[in-house]
């Protein structure tokens, strides 16, 4: 039995040398020795005919032969596959000095560019950026902002209600009142931005979803002059230092007094056109009380900007729907720096 096993080892290595460069022949050799009815299986069957004293030695030799064949075949298969892969790579003649493909990259959306520009301005002035929920309770969306039950803004035709107590926020002021409560009567300077939702009929200038950015300052000795100076900073940042603005009285339930800000545009014929860009005002005393501020000690101002409206005026866009159409031909016009080359 031992002599037979030694001959089989020699036979295996001889066959291996002849077939080591052909993967299919290596698979045949594998099956010949290790298959269900292969040579090793037949050897194992012969063990039962051996005397008991020889079975142990013969069994060890068969197991050694099996492990030797498995290890050697696996090693040769891996070597052959690796050599085949290397040969294939060499045949492709890759030139590593060639420039890489110029993959297309996107750029910052024009609405986000406006938001980032405003945020950079207010960060330089010491403001904090805050974020909040798009699904809000009636309490934080309306009641905290001096809009009690029965107020027109709470009517079903103006808002997207989820249930009797929740809705899609109609402004980002929900972020402000939550931050006011969290500060527990201490001064704050924040801006917040995000999507808001109102039941408008979609057309060239209106959308049921749009972007809004709001600012809020609460401190001692805050007055209308501070608000006006802040509004001038915004318009200069967005439209240039020479841009003239016009303030006119308005009404918002959460500010008193309230104003709307118009850009003053001088036409070629010398006449002036007024384009509304934002609303603002001094924080209503009741809103301060709702958030545990003493209106006798603290005052504040707030402003809200419709980002799409700013972008439409700044870039002379005629249809608000262009911002959401995902048309590369439109968006590439606003790509900054070298990004424009990647479209």
Curated annotation (Swiss-Prot):
Residue sites binding Mg(2+) per the record: 256
Biological process, per Gene Ontology: phenylalanyl-tRNA aminoacylation
Superkingdom field: Bacteria
Stated family: Belongs to the class-II aminoacyl-tRNA synthetase family. Phe-tRNA synthetase alpha subunit type 1 subfamily.
Protein name: Phenylalanine--tRNA ligase alpha subunit
The UniProt record lists the keyword Protein biosynthesis: yes
This protein's UniProt keywords: Aminoacyl-tRNA synthetase, ATP-binding, Cytoplasm, Ligase, Magnesium, Metal-binding, Nucleotide-binding, Protein biosynthesis
PROSITE patterns: AA_TRNA_LIGASE_II
Gene Ontology molecular-function annotations: ATP binding; magnesium ion binding; phenylalanine-tRNA ligase activity; tRNA binding
SUPFAM superfamilies: Class II aaRS and biotin synthetases, tRNA-binding arm
GO CC terms: cytoplasm
